[in-house]
Amino acid sequence: MQVTVIGAGLAGCEAAWQLAQRGISVTLHEMKPEKRTPAHHADSFAELCCSNSLRSDQIENAVGLLKEELRRLDSLIMACADATRVEAGGALAVDREGFSNLVTQKIRSHPNITVVPGEVSAIPEGNVIIASGPLTSDALAAAIAEKIGDGHTLNFFDAAAPLVTFESVNMDSAFFASRYDKGTPDYINCPMSEEEYEAFWQALTTAEEAEVHGFEDKHVFEGCMPVEVMARRGHDTLCYGPLKPRGLRDPKTGQEPYAVVQLRRDNAQGSVYNLVGFQTHLRFPEQKRVFSMIPALKNADFVRYGVMHRNTYLRSPGMLDRYYRLIADDRIAFAGQMTGVEGYIESAASGFLAAVEMARRLEGETPVDFPRETAIGALGLYISDTTVSDFQPMNVNFGIMPPLGYRVRGGKRVKNAALAERALGRIDALREAVLSDRKE
């Protein structure tokens, strides 16, 4: 049995690994290093193009639950993330290069996976999982459009945040802490007074943007919105978003500042930090000018400026089923952000499910029923739900799972913990069936 996987991002690598672990021969196509997209900086697989944070690692948060489900089902991406994690409070952040290099090493060393470099411009014959990502090349995008019909692809834009060196941060104007002192004090917090914020906001909202073809409609994904776009929504919008000071007391004053810019470690050495929530598409000189107005960053050395790029995704409901298979041709499945899931872990989960179910189909087995009560199942059911009127990329959340059916005392966190406990119970019940066909 043989399957072609197109794309060695998080979804494609997870899919290739799960297929290979089940004794299936995998040909993995990756256009790097021969060709790169504007968002790529390295030749390794599973490159984290935006943030190095995989978001919350607490099961009371839906993405934390999704991580735990994948861990229990032997996910490659989660194993590599856990092995390369860096301190980030209650979140799971990874050494960006270390994570990508480990995934690459695992994939390249698997005896059932053959990596073929170069661009794919047509959908191959046979069984295929297309995980070419939101920056799918024009040639392959045209082939996909021809296969599924015009009008089934949509676009939005997202952006990446800048990186600065730790040694260039003025720690006399910053302090280490995690919000509400939760976990370890892993974030560098850069406080701003009301006057400093006012000057920063004025500069940010009037700064010159880089030209991005097709961006005139300002169609951005809310979870990756450029900081300058968010700032224009209102004077204090940032203070309720990425610059919110709640739970962060400046040790110099004992008070919460007017606004706080947080920096998160980007590598294991702690030599590089990213500006949390500062996705942007300002021109590079403007990024240097405006972001240097943050007191702790007045002499910051920017090792990478923020960039913005177009993302492509499918109008999946009515086209894909809950297992990410093309309804019109079930030898083809899709995975990753192009299916309409948003986020690193969500992408890996889609690759996991697409591969597990393709392997079972090739073995003549019936699909494993991941119910809506699980995060993995809920995502598949969301992207295939034809009742969704305005389909847009979405992160996993408890809102796409059914309610408990009974009242829980103790607030939202306790309720979410109960939802997570229910989900993990379902996963544990499915684990034997999911892993039974592995040939390791």
Question: What positions do the PLM features span?
Answer:
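Predominantly flavin-linked oxidoreductase catalytic cores and closely associated redox partners
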Residues: 109-284, 288-289
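A glycine-rich dinucleotide-binding beta-alpha-beta segment and adjacent secondary-structure elements
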Residues: 275-341, 348-350, 368-385, 391-395, ...
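Beta1/beta-strand and adjacent pyrophosphate-binding region of the FAD-binding site
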Residues: 1-11
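N-terminal FAD cofactor-binding segment of flavoenzymes
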Residues: 17-79, 372-383
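Feature captures the FAD/FMN-dependent oxidoreductase FAD-binding
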Residues: 69-143
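A short alpha-helix-loop-beta-strand transition element characteristic
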Residues: 59-63, 67, 75-88, 148-157, ...
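Internal hydrophobic alpha-helix adjacent to the cofactor/substrate pocket in enzyme cavities
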Residues: 347-368
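C-terminal auxiliary extensions adjacent to catalytic cores
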Residues: 391-440
